[in-house]
Amino acid sequence: MRSPGSTVVVVVGEVTDAILRELGRLPNVQALRLTEEGAPTLREVLGAANRPFLVHDLDPLAAVAAAWRGFFDDPSTIGVLRVETESALTAFAAGESVLPDYYLVLDPEGITPAESQWWLGVLAAVAPSRVLPVEATTAAVQRMLASLPTGRAWPDPTGWLRGLHLQVPDRAGLL
């Protein structure tokens, strides 16, 4: 499903239409807002990707993140966390969704503590070079795209997603 020549980047946090629009004007970036009504599916976009960078705002783990936060607010919702985890894993296995090569967390100082614990705690602990904080400006995102670090890829999500109930907010990512 994925175009092997495209680096897939999901932008999260303070994502604006202006940032995506300006990034999309760059010759090497295809930038899309996939969370809007009527947007193409990720499968369609990945199948047609023809630029070095595909930047979009559709976090494949958004429902899992919400369920994880909900579980720590109310532990009786562990079933919701398990359902969302299995749904994400099923979507990955079916090729309906993919983990991006990178997450860019825009305006990390402006996100909620819960979002910070998820993106900069849980996800960054799994693959530190794949989750990067960046200022919420087109210029800053463009600089980051030009200097994305190399590092180990995401490990198989099955193990770490199914162990999310053991990742405690405020402790996620700490050794």
Feature names for model-found ranges:
Residues 44-47, 56-126:
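ATP-dependent NMP and nucleoside kinases share a basic, alpha-helical "lid"
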